[in-house]
Amino acid sequence: MSYGGGYGSSRDHYGGGGGGGYSRGGGYGNGYGNSNGYSHGHSSGGYGSYGGAGGYGGGTGGDRMSNLGAGLKTQNWDLSTMPKFEKSFYKEHPNVSQRSTHEVDAFRKEHEITVQGKNVPRPVETFDEAGFPQYVMSEVKAQGFARPTAIQAQGWPMALSGRDVVGIAETGSGKTLTYCLPAIVHINAQPLLAPGDGPIVLVLAPTRELAVQIQTEITKFGKSSRIRNTCVYGGVPKGPQIRDLTRGVEVCIATPGRLIDMLEAGKTNLRRVTYLVLDEADRMLDMGFEPQIRKIVSQIRPDRQTCMWSATWPKDVRQLAQDFLHDYIQVNIGSMDLSANHRITQIVEIVSEFEKRDRMAKHLDRIMEANKHSKVLIFTGTKRVADDITRFLRQDGWPALSIHGDKQQNERDWVLNEFKTGKSPIMVATDVASRGIDVRDITHVLNYDYPNNSEDYVHRIGRTGRAGAKGTAITLFTTDNAKQARDLVAILSESKQQIDPRLAEMARYGSGGGGNRWGGRGRGRGGFTASNAAPLGNNRRW
């Protein structure tokens, strides 16, 4: 069988443009001041200090700018006037049709496949059963793959059917090919690009590294039908990327900020996009890209096909799926129970509220002695506590900095850069502010305050143990948190962690607690002249 393969011959393939690296761009505004007028750093935008006025310079730029997309026009979609397009290509193979429901269920159980939604297609067990056209299959066979992975076996029929799809699977599960091969089929069924047309397939990814990896796969499997692509990300010159977009590409793989730059500058448009992919959606939200994603999606016709992929399924990712996808079908690989990364050692200590500071300091001492290159992310329940313990740590000689919603954006970027580079190996954060944190080499997470729910606990500790590394999560748990004990014990048990007998007792008998001692919102505005500018004590550490 074939899928609209008649367009391939007129395409000239070229690999995407632009080398270089992913970055936020534009400088960090790297100055700050205290009462002595201390200021330092660098920035393309300039900064200064006199008489204690901290130097904010440079701004953020690149993929971090919160006002990106302000210049994009609101689209009023009238689908009755828009050209129709094909998106349903799946025809079930006879071998698949002949399998009994029992056989299908057994296959899904064996491969830990769970599906949700109406009329989910049956999984395929071989590449031939997926029904890809020869121009795709020739390259698949050339790669020497033995059989589809679990996510591919179930995901290919779903994506080829033209339905909106959510896929939840660990990194390394083969999800990139799960959406790339149907994307190639989709492109070859559409009219050729005309001059001035934007891409047909748009893939949004959180980082340059992932975007380049996706581009490699698209290039490999799209070359037989001469599909052109480009990779658009910040921190590198725009020229080569603009050149590619101007020539015309069927596939654009992009990080959100740089794509909005291109759209605002009129270098491309999304009018032809009919196949949208959000890859690593959870990580894009972690990095604070939700506003940019929403602005981009608003520029795409609403009857598109959308495929959303994520390693986890927290409530903010679920909300994104509800907003962007229509009547979607979902595939999950592995358990859907709330579980923590098994590479993370979880230590939960029962303490009283007034013991927390000393206990935290002792842990930092041990961490420092074991490895001076450690990075520690400390979570608090409120902005006030974040500032309080940052001052406490700095006065005790620890180079700690805090990040929360009352800090100005350029200060938050500066703090994050100090933490990423290891100049300040301790960062104190609230849950909301942590959405912009994407640091791969965090060795320890310390929960100074326990979060409001177990999902946030798993999300917090997941900041360590990334990319195959091991990590440690330390949690200070008080009687005020007793109502969370049962859920916490379940998470610890699932990941085979040691459980403090007192915590187990709380789980058996505990009920509601009084919440955090501080309660409420933090008061006052943060700033370089506040907690982050508190002088380091004489007992310098780290």
UniProtKB/Swiss-Prot annotation:
SMART domains: DEXDc, HELICc. It is an enzyme of class 3 (hydrolase). CDD domains: SF2_C_DEAD. SUPFAM superfamilies: P-loop containing nucleoside triphosphate hydrolases. A motif (Q motif) lies at residues 125-153. Residues 514-542 are annotated as: Disordered. Residues 346-507 form the Helicase C-terminal domain. Coiled coil: none annotated. It holds the Pfam family DEAD. Gene3D superfamilies: P-loop containing nucleotide triphosphate hydrolases. Its EC number is 3.6.4.13. It is found in: Cytoplasm; Nucleus. It comes from the Eukaryota. ATP binds at A169, E170, T171, G172, S173, G174, K175, T176. Residues 514-527 have a biased composition (Gly residues). A motif (DEAD box) lies at residues 279-282. InterPro entries: DEAD/DEAH_box_helicase_dom (IPR011545), Helicase_ATP-bd (IPR014001), Helicase_C-like (IPR001650), P-loop_NTPase (IPR027417), RNA-helicase_DEAD-box_CS (IPR000629), RNA_helicase_DEAD_Q_motif (IPR014014). GO terms for molecular function: ATP binding; ATP hydrolysis activity; RNA binding; RNA helicase activity. Its main location: cytoplasm. One of its GO terms (biological process) is nuclear-transcribed mRNA catabolic process, nonsense-mediated decay. It catalyses: ATP + H2O = ADP + phosphate + H(+). Belongs to the DEAD box helicase family. DDX5/DBP2 subfamily. Associates with polysomes. ATP-dependent RNA helicase involved nonsense-mediated mRNA decay and ribosome biogenesis through rRNA processing. This is ATP-dependent RNA helicase DBP2. It comes from Ajellomyces capsulatus (strain NAm1 / WU24). The lineage of its organism: Eukaryota, Fungi, Dikarya, Ascomycota, Pezizomycotina.
